[in-house]
């Protein structure tokens, strides 16, 4: 893609210290251990460097794919002609400016965030202590477990809004949180960090709850195998794992991809899974569950399609706006001329 190639050249010329990897295999980053190369993989050292990368992409009509720990994503083996921006170096974590709050940048792991909250006697993030993701991804998908969700503890979110090239703070109540999704999925932005509003509690009591949740997780989930977390979102009135199990699909295998024999809600890589294996496996499960129960399962894993391109069409949008303004100006001028011609001297 011409715009992407231009952006890469400008970034290399103007940001020589940036960790920029060309033709980077995504299997090296994704927890499922599947995926071909993306055209470029940028790892900014801080928010300013990340903003600069996004500026060059924006000016060349390209949108990036911003990722954290890549724990719920699958890339095609053929690779994609896109740039991925990793938030892994955005790891600032501190107590917030207001009482009982914590500020964390997008790359902070949810486990580290929960531990920091515990160490400071702040309760509310226990549920997140075993979720294998980062703050950015957790906020984007409203991650949750054991009855808790990110929306319950988010006071505000800091995003880089691409159309205006500016940092914006969004109140938690304005984030459009729903079950395993947020309003940020619908706008051209990147999550940079978040402020969490928590409740004071005894650190030992917080730690005990975290330990109990993590012991349950270890006992019930296939943490010893590559996976992308829960394969499907929880349907209304039930659980995906229970439906899959009831339909006799626990252990169902396509190539190297398998519905876990330990927990039917997980798809795992038995060692040689491919993108096509995962797609076929999940598609079969969805069709079979629907055939037997008339319930449609919605994937929780983000599977990026083959040939996907990310375009920022701001120039076209801007031109459309300008054309509309010019047309309106013509109409206004025509209206004024008509009014003038109606005026007759007395």
Per-range role (PLM):
Residues 36-37, 69-71, 80, 108, ...:
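Gly/Ser/Thr-rich helix-start
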Residues 72-73, 114-117, 125-129, 142-149, ...:
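A generic local secondary-structure boundary/capping motif
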């Amino acid at each position: 893609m011409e715009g992407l190639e231009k952006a890469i050249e400008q970034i290399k010329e103007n940001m020589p210290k940036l960790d920029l990897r060309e033709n980077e295999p995504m299997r090296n980053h994704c927890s499922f251990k599947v995926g071909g190369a993306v055209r470029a993989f940028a790892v900014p050292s801080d928010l300013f460097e990340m903003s600069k990368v996004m500026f060059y992409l924006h000016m060349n009509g390209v949108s990036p794919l911003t990722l954290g720990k890549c724990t719920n994503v699958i890339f095609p083996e053929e690779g994609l002609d896109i740039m991925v921006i990793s938030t892994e170096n955005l790891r600032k974590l501190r107590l917030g400016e207001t009482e009982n709050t914590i500020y964390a940048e997008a790359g902070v792991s949810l486990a580290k965030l929960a531990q920091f909250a515990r160490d400071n006697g702040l309760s509310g993030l226990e549920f997140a202590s075993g979720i294998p993701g980062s703050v950015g991804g957790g906020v984007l998908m409203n991650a949750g477990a054991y009855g808790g969700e990110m929306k319950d503890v988010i006071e505000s979110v800091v995003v880089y809004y691409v159309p205006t090239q500016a940092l914006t703070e969004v109140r938690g109540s304005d984030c459009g949180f729903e079950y395993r999704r947020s309003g940020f999925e619908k706008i051209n932005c990147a999550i940079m960090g978040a402020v969490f509003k928590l409740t004071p509690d005894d650190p030992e009591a917080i730690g005990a709850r975290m330990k109990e949740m993590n012991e349950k997780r270890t006992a019930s989930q296939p943490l010893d195998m590559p996976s992308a977390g829960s394969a499907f979102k929880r349907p209304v009135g039930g659980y995906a794992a229970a439906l899959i199990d009831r339909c006799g699909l626990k252990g169902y295998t396509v190539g190297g991809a398998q519905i876990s024999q330990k927990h039917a809600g997980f798809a795992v890589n038995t060692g040689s899974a491919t993108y096509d294996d995962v797609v076929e496996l999940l598609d079969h499960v969805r069709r079979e569950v629907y055939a037997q129960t008339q319930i449609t399962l919605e994937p929780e894993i983000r599977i990026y399609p083959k040939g996907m391109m990310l375009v920022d069409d701001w120039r076209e949008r801007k031109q459309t706006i300008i054309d509309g303004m010019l047309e309106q100006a013509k109409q206004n001028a025509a209206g004024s001329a008509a009014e003038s011609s109606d005026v007759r001297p007395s």
